[in-house]
């Protein structure tokens, strides 16, 4: 099995290195090939997603991704910015389903910004559609306003749109995920204002007829954002569009104590996927050896489970992470009084020892 390893920018190379060590420590042997992406791709090839990197990603059975982005690239034209690499990979590989688990480990309830009783035992899965919505809708751009109160003034515009096949396929993925968990699915929309999301809601209701054992509910996105803080454990699986999912998944991440703990998977129709931590490249701490590698290590576990059909090995990694937390090891982002603060490499070594 071939894994494309794309470390990227900022803390990406540091955290991916620890995940690779963990994969190498398993009984399985994987063919792993590394390629530049993001700012590293721009520096090497003049583009955030070089042709050879994309070719490797297409040929691989799965992709382990670090993070992209750095302030020094903010002046580049948008198509050349590091963040375009992840958008390009999603588009070219048709990665339409994003899984973002938000799990609060018992040892980390004190690190959450909410009261322990609100987050203890928290286990939410956010299923986000990745290929449609306002992020990719056309037309978009800057122009002279053709009408309205400020006709003739410069305006920026984007297009929110979803096709029926796009909504149906993500709805099926979400219902199937909910069927394997608590059999509760909440579809988050803004159907009271947006035609696109009334359309979304109607299709999700239609798909629900194929999953009678899953309880379907609907919630407007503003209320969902509030309920995630007020009563987060009332959710099991959430399905939503690209932009709403982008925002809500980061909000849910912070309920757990640190976004540095949370993995993610972006899958195609055949479960080939790109696996990455939910956090960004954090250029402010790059090279300092303090980044939390656990989200990336847990992303590698998700890769084993979903794309490589190695659930037993995924369990080993996840159990090792739980053991390390129980032993009191903490990186700076999750440290609490009485725990042992360690750096990136030390945390990786602790997971290896726990394996």
Swiss-Prot record:
The gene is leuB. Its cofactor is Mg(2+); Mn(2+). Substrate binds at residues 90, 100, 128, 222. GO terms for biological process: L-leucine biosynthetic process. NAD(+) binds at residues 280-292. GO terms for molecular function: 3-isopropylmalate dehydrogenase activity; magnesium ion binding; NAD binding. Keywords: Amino-acid biosynthesis, Branched-chain amino acid biosynthesis, Cytoplasm, Leucine biosynthesis, Magnesium, Manganese, Metal-binding, NAD, Oxidoreductase. Catalyzes the oxidation of 3-carboxy-2-hydroxy-4-methylpentanoate (3-isopropylmalate) to 3-carboxy-4-methyl-2-oxopentanoate. The product decarboxylates to 4-methyl-2 oxopentanoate. The record marks 135, 190 as: Important for catalysis. Binds 1 Mg(2+) or Mn(2+) ion per subunit. Mg(2+) binds at residues 222, 246, 250. Homodimer. Pathway: Amino-acid biosynthesis; L-leucine biosynthesis; L-leucine from 3-methyl-2-oxobutanoate: step 3/4. The keyword Nucleotide-binding does not apply. The lineage of its organism: Bacteria, Pseudomonadati, Pseudomonadota, Betaproteobacteria, Burkholderiales. Pfam families: Iso_dh. Its EC number is 1.1.1.85. It catalyses: (2R,3S)-3-isopropylmalate + NAD(+) = 4-methyl-2-oxopentanoate + CO2 + NADH. Belongs to the isocitrate and isopropylmalate dehydrogenases family. LeuB type 1 subfamily. GO terms for cellular component: cytosol. Its main location: cytoplasm. The keyword NAD applies. This is 3-isopropylmalate dehydrogenase. It comes from Cupriavidus metallidurans (strain ATCC 43123 / DSM 2839 / NBRC 102507 / CH34). It is found in: Cytoplasm.
């Amino acid at each position: 099995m071939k894994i494309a390893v794309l470390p990227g920018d900022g803390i990406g190379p540091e955290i991916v290195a620890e995940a690779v060590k963990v994969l190498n420590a398993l009984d399985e042997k994987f063919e792993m090939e590394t390629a530049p992406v993001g700012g590293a791709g721009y520096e090497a090839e003049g583009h955030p997603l070089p042709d050879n990197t994309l070719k490797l990603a297409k040929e691989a059975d799965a992709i382990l991704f670090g993070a992209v982005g750095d302030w020094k690239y903010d002046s580049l034209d948008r198509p050349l910015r590091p963040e375009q690499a992840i958008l390009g990979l999603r588009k070219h590989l048709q990665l339409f389903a994003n899984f973002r688990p938000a799990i609060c480990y018992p040892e980390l309830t004190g690190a959450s910004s909410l009261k322990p009783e609100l987050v203890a035992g928290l286990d939410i899965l956010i299923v986000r559609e990745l290929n449609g919505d306002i992020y990719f809708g056309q037309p978009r751009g800057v122009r002279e306003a053709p009408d309205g109160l400020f006709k003739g003034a410069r305006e920026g515009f984007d297009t929110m749109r979803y096709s029926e096949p796009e909504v149906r396929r993500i709805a099926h993925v979400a219902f199937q995920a909910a069927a394997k968990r608590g059999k509760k699915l909440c579809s988050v929309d803004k159907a009271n204002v947006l035609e696109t999301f009334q359309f979304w809601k109607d299709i999700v209701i239609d798909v629900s007829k194929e999953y009678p054992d899953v309880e379907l509910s609907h919630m407007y996105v503003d209320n969902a954002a509030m309920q995630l803080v007020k009563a987060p454990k009332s959710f099991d699986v959430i399905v939503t569009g690209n932009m709403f999912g982008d925002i809500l998944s980061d909000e849910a991440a912070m309920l757990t104590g640190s976004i540095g703990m949370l993995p993610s998977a972006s899958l195609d129709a055949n479960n080939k996927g790109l696996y990455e931590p939910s956090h960004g490249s954090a250029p402010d701490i790059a090279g300092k050896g303090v980044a939390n590698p656990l989200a990336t290590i847990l992303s590698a576990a998700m890769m084993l489970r979903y794309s490589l059909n190695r659930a037993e090995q995924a369990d080993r990694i996840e159990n090792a992470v739980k053991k390390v937390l129980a032993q009191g090891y903490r990186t700076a982002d999750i440290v609490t009084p009485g725990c042992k603060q360690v750096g990136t490499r030390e945390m990786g070594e602790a997971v290896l020892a726990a394996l």
